[in-house]
Amino acid sequence: MDKKQFIKICRKLYDRKYVVGSGGNVSVKEGDKIYLTPTGSILGFLKEDDIAEMDLDGNVIKGKPTSEKNLHLMIYRKRNDINAIIHTHSLISTFLSTINKEIELLTPEGKIFLKKIGYVDYYEAGSLKLAEETAKRDEDVIILKNHGVVCLGKDLIDAYIKVEVLEEQAKLTLLNLLVKK
């Protein structure tokens, strides 16, 4: 696993305010191993040695994985095509979920990269129920009501691009709402 790229993506998420404080988490699956951000970590200050490791059976190999580890684990078990997961608290995407407004795919990039957005009702962060309901979704981009977003990818860059494009579509959706009033 490319730990330098993992750290670089985590810093981008933090620097671009897709996550704040100790919010959000990232994972990469390689073979039967999952590399995850540790619980309570601040993604903008993560170091290579901080990265936690688990196997696909849920056994911790190194560190203390994110409290959302079950969400990552259940998605990887269900989706063989997914090798990276990014969970953020992107501001506009999350805000729209609080007012029950679905994000519209308004540009070619939105339609190409996101295709379709899934939605999950509110469940407590880190709960087994949240993990189960999220893993039931077939989309690569999932909005967690009043919580954040989960973007899945064939690799870390693919998942990251979906985070960026989703937030752009959310901003456009919000602007559309404001103009229509």
UniProtKB/Swiss-Prot annotation:
Substrate binds at G24, N25, T39, G40, T66, S67. Binds 1 zinc ion per subunit. GO terms for biological process: pentose catabolic process. The active site is at E68. Its EC number is 4.1.2.17. The keyword Zinc applies. Trimethyl phosphonoacetate and DL-threose are competitive inhibitors with respect to dihydroxyacetone phosphate, and uncompetitive inhibitors with respect to DL-glyceraldehyde. Signal peptide: none annotated. Pathway: Cofactor biosynthesis; coenzyme F420 biosynthesis. SUPFAM superfamilies: AraD/HMP-PK domain-like (SSF53639). The keyword Metal-binding applies. It is an enzyme of class 4 (lyase). Keywords: Lyase, Metal-binding, Zinc. Its cofactor is Zn(2+). Involved in the biosynthesis of the coenzyme F420 which requires phospholactate produced via the aldol cleavage of L-fuculose 1-phosphate and the NAD(+)-dependent oxidation of (S)-lactaldehyde. Catalyzes the reversible cleavage of L-fuculose 1-phosphate (Fuc1P) to yield dihydroxyacetone phosphate (DHAP) and S-lactaldehyde. FucA possesses a high specificity for the dihydroxyacetone phosphate (DHAP), but accepts a great variety of different aldehydes such as DL-glyceraldehyde and glycolaldehyde. Homotetramer. This is L-fuculose phosphate aldolase. The gene is fucA.
